A protein has these predicted regions:
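Mg2+-dependent prenyl diphosphate-binding active-site environment of isoprenoid biosynthetic enzymes
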Residues: 1-176
């Protein structure tokens, strides 16, 4: 879903950047790493995801951690390939990398996971739950749509509007 949102937002702003494909792949890797880590015993301790045994259940907890770490690192290695595909777009690629790192990091998805883990076994108020969803789910959707807009040459005002819309999309996707 996230790469498609990135591509469609890019198209909406008239983009045709060759830098888009590495970012789409990177986004899917970041999302997958987050699921691998979320399933670990220290986090949600899930045995199954999408009807199949989780990574750590098949390969062990140590390999689950390393697989997630490898996916995150390879995601950024892949995104950096955009510089060689579209060197003339270095400024927008740099801005896209900044957004990707921020939304996947402590002010985004990881921050949401920190709150989630800290609330394990506790009753959680709706506002806190909304914050967790906004950060864990919404942040990567925001990044996807913002990166699509950035690489298409959208203005900062348009990017801020996309971020607001994407936040609503993220919250709606958790409500299903």
């Amino acid at each position: 879903m996230r790469p498609m949102l990135m591509q469609e937002t890019h198209r909406l702003f008239g983009g045709d950047s060759p830098a888009l494909a590495p970012f789409m792949a990177a986004m899917e890797m970041i999302h997958t790493y987050s699921l691998v880590h979320d399933d670990l015993p220290a986090m949600d301790n899930d045995d199954y995801r999408r009807g199949r045994l989780t990574t750590w259940r098949v390969y062990g907890e140590d390999m689950g951690i390393l697989a997630g770490d490898a996916l995150l690192n390879y995601a950024f290695e892949t995104a950096f390939q955009a510089f060689s595909l579209a060197p003339e777009e270095a400024s927008s690629i740099g801005r896209a990398l900044q957004v990707l790192g921020e939304k996947a990091g402590i002010r985004g998805m990881i921050g949401g996971q920190v709150i989630d883990v800290g609330k394990t076994g506790q009753a959680v108020e709706k506002e806190v739950l909304d914050t967790i969803y906004e950060l864990k789910t919404g942040a990567l959707i925001e990044a996807s749509m913002m990166v699509g807009a950035i690489l298409a040459g959208a203005s900062e005002e348009e990017i801020k509007t996309v971020e607001k819309i994407a936040s609503c999309v993220g919250l709606a996707s958790r409500s299903r």
